[in-house]
């Protein structure tokens, strides 16, 4: 099991110390959908911790290729379903950087309804 899998397992359990232990202290994680950039592991973990309200975190797929790991997760959050695609780079067995993109189910409406 790699650091990304351990991170998401810890997020699912809301085990914030275990989640933080998977990241380098100065890991850079970007959330382009909100224009957030977390330059320290503690800031990224705090953002997750303060969000709260999750009833289920289901990691559907993890793909590893050397130091690069991708994850696809589905999150039930206070009655809404969110999807996360994450791309991470590992260094010395920890997450050094990553980009996570979240979208809410149906957030943009159906393509057919936009005509």
Residue ranges of model-derived segments:
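A solvent-exposed, acidic/Ser-Thr-rich amphipathic alpha-helical stretch
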Residues: 16-65
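A beta-strand edge to alpha-helix "cap/lid" segment located at domain peripheries
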Residues: 46-115
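Short, aromatic-enriched amphipathic alpha-helices that serve as compact interaction elements
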Residues: 1-15, 22
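Alpha-helical interaction segments
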Residues: 5-7, 21, 34-35, 78
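Residue-level recognition of short, well-ordered coil/turn positions
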Residues: 15-16, 94
């Amino acid at each position: 099991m790699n650091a990304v899998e351990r991170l998401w397992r810890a997020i699912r359990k809301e085990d914030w110390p275990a989640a933080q232990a998977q990241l380098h202290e100065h890991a850079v994680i970007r959330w382009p959908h909100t224009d957030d950039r977390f330059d320290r592991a503690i800031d990224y973990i705090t953002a997750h911790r303060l969000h709260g309200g999750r009833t289920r975190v289901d990691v559907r797929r993890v793909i590893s290729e050397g130091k690069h790991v991708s994850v696809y997760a589905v999150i039930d959050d206070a009655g809404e379903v969110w999807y996360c695609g994450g791309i991470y780079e590992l260094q010395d067995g920890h997450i050094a950087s990553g980009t996570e993109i979240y979208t809410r189910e149906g957030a943009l409406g159906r393509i057919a309804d936009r005509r």
